[in-house]
Structure formats: structure tokens, C-alpha cells
Amino acid sequence: MASAALFYDSRATIARRLTLHCQYMARAVLFAQCRSAETMLTFILDLSWLFPDENGMRDNTCCYIVATITMALDLLRDRVLAVAVSLDVELLPYVYIVVTHTRLHLLASLLNYPPVHLDVRRMVSEAALHSACEVLRAAVRGEDQLKYIPNNLVIMICYASCISHVPKVRRLVAQLLQFSWTKQGLFTHCVSLLVATLAAKSGSQNSR
């Protein structure tokens, strides 16, 4: 939602409130000892909204990242190192979206890093677009298995659509934000975002 709010000047207040909420989460995790596995995982995915100062070393973003990842690994160690029952079992749609969105977030961080070479930036951009498409595909294909739509899933879909750089994405995201997160409205716009993203991707490849 913070990513989508940045597209509109009128949503600056929302972006500010989300930033303050992330700072509240940081204090809750580091000082109030709120360290459940779910809270830590959500905090890691939301670290991108901790906007740094003009000089990245002036704020505590790096400390938040290091402390959060360290505590999250300790809490999730028994889950991460679990023995797989079968290699043929597919991930649940929500879990697959979380994993793919994490990869997308890392690629987007590289795109925002100025010293990246042009060829590397182009390769990372294509990989980010592929991950964004996978997030949208998983949301559409897993419609039957998703009994409800968590807010963070909607945030991931909006983030994926923004990364896709589709010309019509601003209007689609604006329409998506107006819904009350019902399954019917969400998946209808997921299909629209996916079709528009794939069309833009195929058009850019043909122009080459």
C-alpha cells in the first residue's frame, strides 16, 4: 500500500502513516520483545518502507535489518530446517506468493542501487518483471485455495504490479485500492494486471 500511495500526491499522508507504523513495529520488535515468528516474517517483508535519511548511515535502518534477520532466523530455524516429506509437494499459494515476493523485493532493491551497471540493471529488471508476473499468476491460480485475502497479500500484489512498470498500472492500482479486499474484486483486477503485464512484456520484446 505504501508503494501504491507513492504514485499519488494526495496519498502522501497515507505513506507517512505507513512509515510511522513501520517504525512502531521496529520498536515493538527490538524493545518490547514482540518476536513471534509471524511478526518477524512480516517485519522483514515490510523493511523496504523504512525510508532512509539523505545519508543512509544517519538512521537505524541497517541496525533494524541486522537485528530482525538475526532474530527471525533464530525463531524460524526449526521451520526452515524441517525435513521435506516429498519433493513433489507444491507450496501453498500464499506461501509461494510470500517466497516470490521476497525474491522480487531483493531484485527491486538492486534496481534502486545507483552504482549497478546498465547490463546488470537490465538483467535484474527482467528477473524482477518475471517475479512480479509469478506473484500475479499465483494469486489467480490459487483462487480456490485462498479462503480469504490477508492485507499483506494485497500489498504484495500491488507491489508486484508497480514493479511491472505497466503503462496502465497506475489506473489499475487505483481501482484495486478502492476495493474492500473481497475475493471477487481482487482476483478480477489480478487477472487484468497479469494480462496487461504480459502484454507489455511481449510488446517490449517484439520492439527489440
From Swiss-Prot:
Keywords assigned: Nucleus, Transcription, Transcription regulation
Subcellular compartments: Nucleus
Primary location: nucleus
GO cellular component terms listed in the entry, alphabetical order: nucleus
UniProt function note: Transcriptional regulator that may regulate the expression of the satratoxin biosynthesis SC1 cluster, one of the 3 clusters involved in the biosynthesis of satratoxins, trichothecene mycotoxins that are associated with human food poisonings.
General remark: Trichothecenes are sesquiterpenoid toxins that act by inhibiting protein biosynthesis.
UniProt-recorded name of the protein: Satratoxin biosynthesis SC1 cluster transcription factor SAT9
